């Protein structure tokens, strides 16, 4: 009732999402200790939890932090698939190359304040984005 899914259905859906993301082929149950998972598998579980309710906006704060190249690519592939499903992803990161590759729009913050916004078609390289960031933040 009231939109809640039964526990078995929740576990089934969580496992489907985790496998879809590609972080693990292990089946996870309600009693599975997260501590037994690798960093990438934990990240997969966290992302699966974030998309579980089919939210229109998914916030990923440093989702590739401490991941291998293979796991990072899985995050990128997943984000691209989410974007194709008409959901938005707020991708927060410090790696300018990751941010540039995955984003359509950029919002530059300085001390929590929005100081500049631009679309990907306004720039051609991550280095150009970095220069705009330096110039914008340096002006404040």
Q: Where are each of the predicted segments found?
A:
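Glycine-rich phosphate-binding loops of nucleotide-dependent enzymes
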Residues: 1-140
